[in-house]
């Protein structure tokens, strides 16, 4: 699976704006070796996203079943949350919960965006992937190195984008969470079409 905080102060998340990242790669600069302190700061911006959708019953099409999914995202400037398109796309209702809080807040999608590379990562660089594993309420932080940089298709839209692959363990539910290099976001964790890369 290929992967990807910004300092943020939580004033109120009652009217959260979610910004979708279809291209997945958001490069913000070079890393510095203050990893543990930077990871502690990064965790404060990670949110758990709850997506709800109604799925039809094929036997009784007039009945629908509500399904709930959880994934990750992270706060950026302007009271916005950055995540992947597949995390919140095609869902009828969204809620977010910030790190360390039991309260869920209603959220809505405000924009879709395509982000281009500003800095390339290189094979062998250390990264940290953050997010909430599926059915987990505690942020998972996994460390790895960049093992490959290449174009791949994003499973949600089949758009070919430049991605990084890592040996860090990426659990389901972490999708949409940040991948951090030093004190910068290197990208966003996302799903992959190829089962061999997961």
From Swiss-Prot:
Transmembrane segments: none annotated. Residues 48-198 are annotated as: Serine protease. It holds the Pfam family Trypsin_2. The active site is at residues 86, 175. SUPFAM superfamilies: Trypsin-like serine proteases (SSF50494). Belongs to the peptidase S1B family. This is Putative Do-like 15 protein. It comes from Arabidopsis thaliana (Mouse-ear cress).
């Amino acid at each position: 699976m290929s992967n990807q905080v910004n300092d943020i102060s939580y004033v109120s998340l009652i009217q959260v704006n979610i910004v979708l990242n279809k291209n997945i790669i958001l490069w913000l600069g070079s890393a510095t070796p203050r990893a543990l302190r930077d990871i502690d700061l990064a965790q404060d911006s990670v949110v758990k996203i709850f997506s709800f959708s109604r799925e039809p019953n094929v036997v009784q099409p007039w009945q629908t079943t509500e399904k709930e999914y959880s994934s990750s995202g992270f706060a950026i400037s302007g009271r916005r949350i950055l995540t992947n398109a597949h995390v919140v796309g095609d869902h009828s209702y969204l809620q977010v919960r910030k790190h360390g809080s039991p309260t869920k807040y209603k959220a809505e999608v405000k924009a879709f965006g395509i982000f281009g590379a500003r800095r390339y990562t290189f094979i062998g660089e250390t990264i940290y992937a953050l997010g909430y594993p599926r059915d987990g309420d505690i942020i998972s932080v996994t460390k790895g190195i960049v093992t490959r940089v290449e174009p791949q298709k994003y499973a949600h839209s089949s758009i070919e984008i430049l991605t990084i692959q890592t040996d860090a363990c990426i659990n389901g539910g972490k999708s949409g969470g940040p991948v951090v290099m030093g004190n910068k976001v290197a990208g966003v964790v996302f799903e992959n079409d190829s089962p061999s890369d997961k």
